[in-house]
Amino acid sequence: MNHNMPECIARFTDILGQATMKTILGLASNGEGTADSLMEQYERGEISTDAFIDGIMQHAQRPTTREEIIAAWNAMHGGIPQERLQLIQSWKDAGHRLFLLSNNNDLHWQHILSLYDMSMFEYCFASHLLHMSKPDPRIYEAVDAQLKQKGCEGPFHFVDDILINRTTAEQLGWKTYATLDELNAVL
């Protein structure tokens, strides 16, 4: 999935102001969340969508609505290019078993489900439903255990553009790739 952080940050800066936006969403200069930020808590499913939105509304520098906050939040989702979806579908068509592990939250998850057919994946694992997020080794261990319990045998192939996420997965014996094209070359 592509992320459109500049658009999301611009919208939240308008709602919250620059300093408050960085504090509330826990954004470092690189756009990544910090461990105890409202954003990270939401991504791990530790707080509800209502609590997340209320937390933002409490610090808004101007009148705002829940709908405006949801639109700003979903602006982060930059879409999945059609060619990526076609490549993933081609793997399913070729008989490969596909699983999704995503750091996500309820608003983004519902947004994604409304836009894309996720039936290409046999199982989908989202951080907010597992109450953990990558790169915490526990999320990989939980997914690994659930897949093996369902009769899926490793080693699993894992695509993630973030090095620390791949490194943690490798420690469990997963084969990792930075891009879909890298994985496609070995399938």
Residue ranges and their predicted role:
Residues D14-N30, Q61-A72, C152-P155:
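Short, surface-exposed acidic
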Residues M5, G33-A35, T49, N105:
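N-terminal alpha-helical segment
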Residues S48, M76-E83, P135, I139:
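Soluble or luminal CAZymes and related metallo-dependent hydrolases
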Residues C8-F12, I53-I56, W73, H108-I112:
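Hydrophobic alpha-helical core bundles mediating ligand binding, dimerization, or RNAP-core interactions
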Residues M1-G31, T167, Q171, A185:
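Active-site neighborhood of HAD-like aspartate-dependent phosphohydrolases
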Residues D36-I70:
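A metal-dependent, Asp-based hydrolase signature
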Residues K92, N105-L187:
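Asp-based, Mg2+/Mn2+-dependent phosphohydrolase catalytic module
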Residues T65-L113:
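Substrate-recognition element of Asp-dependent hydrolases with the DxDx(T/V) motif
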